[in-house]
């Protein structure tokens, strides 16, 4: 039975929904002012795994991931680039989709952009004003009245104090608001901007929404019954963003609830959270130029999703070598996947039972991955003397790997992709010719000539490996 750690209750809880129930999932998306970095990649790969596993168990999922396409960061970046917000945002969204496609992420069922929901946001603010949870400040901003929401802090067990920064307030002078931590719902502007992506008309004059009300309004619009089964995001969003979301949503609809709050750990680089603010971010594009997307996924899954991941090239290379070794075990195996094999069937197998036990324990992917490694070792062990068993094990490895989005390439194609990454065309042609020449000499049992070519390939940075069935090569 699946158990998931709920941030709200601080414990693992049984996920006991009926299989025919649609599971509503909302994950906070990207603010589109710059390239996506691997902190984003980790968060969305984690929720990709969660959704894949729920679907494997037989659940129907309805997955929403929003796009923040209006924000101070976007406005400032557009000014720096001397381009319109519209051009900047659309360019970043296009690159984001390209990155996510390369990472083989499941597409959300809905991907609402904030600017497409301005009317809904205005309606939400009207309701908060009506319910006495918001007010118009002296500078005409609309702010949330924090003192009136008595349950504030029940998700994170944290409260604001004067030393903390609520980063949706926009003035350094706080004397125009009731509480120093009241956050902005609507940012007033003196006039409509020429760039209509910046300001919109409202009953309170021209302006634009604050960050927290954007997610809350989108959730309120899509989940009419006021229930979200899984709400997720990075742990950095727990406070104040998700705390503020709850305050707004419950102030609009007192019956609003989230069944499971799931938060992923941060990616740490150079002793800080990976962030453009700290100038320590590594873009997804950079990583994809060096590593296959499945290697990146494997790297993330080797650390439990709730734990921080300390990024280093050294660890990434180590994970790459482990992953390549597993893929290599699939070479020359005949994989047959019976898609009709059900969940109960797998539970009867000891190794696979351990895999599902790990996944049912709060998506324990490090343990699940170690079991995949064990299957790979058994394939190697049986390849020579028990081909039948090796093929069954290889089929199991691919079957279980698919649940995690892994081992979906033909092994030979995988090694071609990995080998060819960032290599010049001329070098690849030379290597291919030498490799085929060596295979020819091996077939003729001309071992001396075969060894000479192996040494030449090594000088080109290529290692050739042989087994009892075939040969293959990889770049060092």
UniProtKB/Swiss-Prot annotation:
Main location group: cytoplasm
EC category name: ligase
Transmembrane segments: none
Subcellular location: Cytoplasm
Binding site for Zn(2+): 28, 215, 241, 245
Gene Ontology molecular functions: ATP binding; cysteine-tRNA ligase activity; zinc ion binding
Motif 'HIGH' region in this chain: 30-40
InterPro entries reported in the protein's UniProt record: Cys-tRNA-ligase (IPR015803), Cys-tRNA-synt_Ia_DALR (IPR015273), Cys-tRNA/MSH_ligase (IPR024909), Rossmann-like_a/b/a_fold (IPR014729), tRNA-synt_1_cat_dom (IPR032678), tRNAsynth_Ia_anticodon-bd (IPR009080)
Cofactor(s) it depends on: Zn(2+)
Protein name: Cysteine--tRNA ligase
UniProt organism field: Buchnera aphidicola subsp. Cinara cedri (strain Cc)
